[in-house]
Amino acid sequence: MKNAYIIDAIRTPFGRYAGGLAPVRADDLGAVPIKALIQRNPNVDWEQVDDVIYGCANQAGEDNRNVGRMSALLAGLPYQVPATTINRLCGSSLDAIAIAARAIKAGEANLVIAGGVESMSRAPYVMGKSDSAFGRSQKIEDTTMGWRFINSKLKELYGVDTMPQTAENVAEKFNVNRADQDQFALVSQQRTASAQAKGFFSKEIVAVEIPQRKGDAVVIDTDEHPRASTTLEALSKLKPVVKADGTVTAGNASGINDGAAALLIASDDAVQAYNLKPRAKIIASTAVGVEPRIMGFAPAPAIKKLLKQANLTLDQMDVIELNEAFAAQALAVTRDLGLPDDSAKVNPNGGAIALGHPLGASGARLVTTALNQLEQTGGRYALCSMCIGVGLGIALIIERVEAH
């Protein structure tokens, strides 16, 4: 079996909902990191890229009709290069990386761009067609996140709890209290603020330029969602979003955001042919299913399954990038794995509570950030994992090449 190497990884800043990136279409936003890969890797013959695999969770608006293909063309890749868009909801871009790695390991590809994009600010309202002529069954659905066009049979089988409701379910099932969730959220904000102050994220971010009718373009080059001034007192005053005695708040949950990320993944043959310098090797990946009502717990079994599959241990992981959909689920996962709530190896530069969670782009962000952390600290292995709506979990392990 061949090796699959990460050659480069880049992302846009993550914008706040209705923030700086809101004027940018999803396909234009998705093109930004691909274009950056092209500019940063001049040795590559881009016509020889075997595929572009992009994740996107919505696909109901401007991200319709294969946003991966549209982003690739808008970025300037030759039209001969194929592209596809996959949808494993929040785990889409992590899955895209895993699919790219499998294709390369199987000898079916040598060069693949994998990543994802999400513009939650521009998610449209949609309306289905009537079941009958002049019917009145239609209703308008907001596609920003969560369920729409619910299947009554699925609802009867597993329920259709909202994402915050699933987090409450996890908090109750695994005894994660409000104080611990708020403390976890505070640490995420503090770590992100520290990383931003040190310029950690600058190495993984490509600026987005937004042309204006008059004057210079607006340049977005910094993540907009972090709140460096967050305090535990402020977090404790926020009202629960699900029920009066609940524990999940806007402060201990991830954001609704816009962003894109892309990685260049290559085989041994491509590395040699284009004189590329591998940064990391993709070791293994897996996905699992859990009961949809506790979807946030899914990274725990996914990580356990993956470590067994890769014949590695949790102690061998130098960095763990666990997507912080909610503090409740992140704590349930880390505690199940035997990790302390403030583990230094888990999200050392903060996570989605601070940085934000543009669904289809987040997995690629996790890998990009994990890779940079490995390189900065000299670590060997990084594990990236995410919970996914409708009861799924996904995980992937990379190994820094120079540590091998």
Regions found by a protein language model. Give the residues of each.
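Active-site pocket-lining segment
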Residues: 166-168, 201-206, 212, 283-354
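Conserved catalytic cysteine-centered active-site region
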Residues: 24, 56-112, 141-147, 157-162, ...
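Conserved beta-ketoacyl condensing-enzyme motif
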Residues: 22-91, 95-112, 116-135, 205-221, ...
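N-terminal extracellular/periplasmic Venus flytrap/periplasmic-binding protein-like
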Residues: 11, 23, 27-32, 43, ...
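Short, well-ordered amphipathic alpha-helical segments that serve as non-catalytic structural scaffolds
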Residues: 27-42, 67-71, 96-99, 163-170, ...
